[in-house]
């Protein structure tokens, strides 16, 4: 009797000790934090002792091994730290004792992690594949949390690392293996690495069956068919996950099996087609109706799905599909085609006669426009002086600038030009006057000839005018080419300023050819249309037009 009592007491003592004892392990040179198996309020005092020597564990954080309340910290751990540690939770009314069995192992030279270093195995499936990092909640760590499988870093969009766990999308059997999490523990500014490994297994979700769910057709669906054409009806139903037994789909006509209905035109396919929808096993059955007739519209078509849970029925009826009015469609297409053709023709015509249309619109809508932009002139003419004189003693360029240009633009169109030599006051500083007049002009007309590359006055006016147009965006430039620069000297155009060359390439030039213009002062010529198009809207009535009124009065 005494022997049995002793045995029972021994078992109770062992089970009690085991209940309040915890196994912990780690690797050398890594951080290890152990929690006391006996829990208590945060205000309770917890004393730690090394059981073999009954020596108290210090609480000073400068020590490599120190106690911090319910936690025992090894920063870092050493193999010699292995042993049993005692923690005593002290309260005003009781004391509770717990034991922590700590084992520190040497780091493995190879990639294999022995079983005694593995944490509990977790399993996952296609819908649940979380792998938690063991004991991470005990540490003061920050992201990132690194994950490895069989010592290989995980890569790919299938692996998603969350705060303390790993999620694997579309889990497969090949995903089973040993997964290691690695993070950094921070203690008073010092960093210590921590690793933990656990196995992950993939399990197949158990199959299940459910009451049939018909995906198609919808209940009381009306399907439109064309008389004389073939029609197909599909009955599709799902029965659960995994292999399904005693599941079937079929069609009935007016409550009768297809084979018993006796209409050879209406037949269902031999066998059932298996498919999967959202992981569920489904069966499909197609009913084929050849040469649809009027009497087929009066029949009731039933899609039946049945298994061990029961029978579900969806009813379908046929209706005549309104014939397509091809004549109306052809008319609509024809009208749209004609409309698009007209638009294209109008666009082409407008593009061809855009300048004429713009000038006509100016004459009709706003023939004259007063501006308060601080400008005095509509255009400043930049041209080379001292040009080679013709046989009659007058320069062709100066004749064009001083005679033809003012006669057309000022007398016939109502513009105000500023021309060097004509609009300069006697005794006025030339440089100041040129710069002021250029800035007070809305357009800058450049007369381009081979002479411009050797003319200093032209170079200065060109620089000021281009600065206003390109840098200050205060005016626009009109380029008139009196002689093709490439005809006399291929290097002439290359000698121009880069900005002027850029304008010539971007907007082009208006070419004046005396030999090609019959009436040099006709507003209907192509040359003057392009010049007027690039000029602003006139601000006053042309001189010749305004002089007609007093002349007419005198005749009366």
From Swiss-Prot:
Ubiquitinated at Lys-321 in a FBXL19-mediated manner; leading to proteasomal degradation. Ubiquitination by TRAF6 via 'Lys-27'-linked polyubiquitination and deubiquitination by USP38 serves as a critical regulatory mechanism for fine-tuning IL1RL1-mediated inflammatory response. Glycans are attached at residues 54, 95, 101, 140, 191, 232, 254, 273. SUPFAM superfamilies: Immunoglobulin, Toll/Interleukin receptor TIR domain. GO terms for biological process: immune response; inflammatory response; interleukin-33-mediated signaling pathway; macrophage differentiation; negative regulation of T-helper 1 type immune response; negative regulation of type II interferon production; positive regulation of chemokine production; positive regulation of inflammatory response. Residues 19-103, 114-197, 212-319 form the Ig-like C2-type domain. PROSITE patterns: IG_LIKE, TIR. CDD domains: Ig2_IL1R-like. Highly expressed in kidney, lung, placenta, stomach, skeletal muscle, colon and small intestine. Isoform A is prevalently expressed in the lung, testis, placenta, stomach and colon. Isoform B is more abundant in the brain, kidney and the liver. Isoform C is not detected in brain, heart, liver, kidney and skeletal muscle. Expressed on T-cells in fibrotic liver; at protein level. Overexpressed in fibrotic and cirrhotic liver. The keyword Membrane applies. SMART domains: IG, IGc2, TIR. The active site is at residue 461. GO terms for molecular function: cytokine receptor activity; interleukin-1 receptor activity; interleukin-33 binding; interleukin-33 receptor activity; NAD+ nucleosidase activity, cyclic ADP-ribose generating. It holds the Pfam family TIR. The keyword Transmembrane applies. It catalyses: NAD(+) + H2O = ADP-D-ribose + nicotinamide + H(+). The chain crosses the membrane at residues 329-349. It comes from the Eukaryota. Residues 375-535 form the TIR domain. Its EC number is 3.2.2.6. The TIR domain mediates NAD(+) hydrolase (NADase) activity. Self-association of TIR domains is required for NADase activity. Interacts with MYD88, IRAK1, IRAK4, and TRAF6. Bound to its ligand IL-33, interacts with IL1RAP to form the minimal interleukin-33 signaling complex with a 1:1:1 stoichiometry. Interacts with KIT (bound to KITLG/SCF). A mast cell-specific KITLG/SCF-induced interleukin-33 signaling complex contains IL1RL1, IL1RAP, KIT and MYD88. Interacts with TMED1. Belongs to the interleukin-1 receptor family. PANTHER family: INTERLEUKIN-1 RECEPTOR FAMILY MEMBER (PTHR11890), INTERLEUKIN-1 RECEPTOR-LIKE 1 (PTHR11890:SF7). This is Interleukin-1 receptor-like 1. It comes from Homo sapiens (Human). The gene is IL1RL1.
